[in-house]
Design a protein with these regions (language model features):
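Low-complexity, acidic/polar, glycine-enriched regions of mature
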Residues: 20-180
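Bacterial Sec-dependent N-terminal signal peptides
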Residues: 1-26
Length: 180
């Protein structure tokens, strides 16, 4: 009996040790086929558009999402609900220091720091989001199906010192940007 228990403990220890050595697989995002879709709200409505990724990757261990990192090209901000002069004006304004200050801050980053499975192919994630040099944690859901992943984030722009158009800080509470 003692030998059987000892053998079970040895097998369990070997199995647990082996699981600690499961390789992390990094899958690079195809940035030519991927985009950030955004929708920004204002008092009188909203605007939406896209931003390109410079790079991105997701990390998996035994086919389970464990992390990732994305670098967003803020110079690529593109409003898609307007055209002509109004589109050009809004794109320029979003790139200016009033909003994202892309000359000084050409990229934004999202580094996934914690992932918990919430269902089949679904995860609750926490990441460090850096916009305009300011890094804050953000929680979101991410779904991964084969080679496709989608996530939706709600970001309070005022937390990143993007307060254009407000009389005071309190006027900006509740302003958000949806990213998918």
């Amino acid at each position: 009996m003692k030998k059987r228990i000892l053998n079970s403990v040895v097998v369990l220890a070997v199995a647990m040790g082996a699981s600690a050595f499961v390789d992390v697989v990094t899958k690079e995002v195809n940035v030519k086929q991927s985009q950030v879709h955004w929708k920004g709200y204002k008092v009188t409505g909203s605007h939406y558009g896209t931003i390109d990724l410079k790079s991105g990757s997701l990390e998996f261990q035994a086919d389970v999402l464990t992390g990732g990192e994305f670098i967003v090209d803020m110079n690529s901000i593109n409003t898609t609900d307007l055209s002509g002069e109004y589109k050009d004006q809004l794109d320029g304004h979003l790139k200016s220091d009033d909003f994202f200050g892309v000359e000084k801050y050409p990229t934004a980053t999202l580094k996934i720091t914690k992932v918990t499975a919430s269902g089949k192919n679904s995860y609750d994630a926490t990441a460090d989001l850096t916009i305009k040099g300011k890094t804050l944690p953000v929680d979101f859901e991410i779904s991964v199906y084969g080679s496709k992943a989608t996530a939706n984030l709600k970001i309070d722009r005022s937390k990143y010192n993007i307060r254009y158009g407000s009389g005071s800080f309190f006027d900006n509470l509740g302003r958000r940007v949806d990213v998918s």
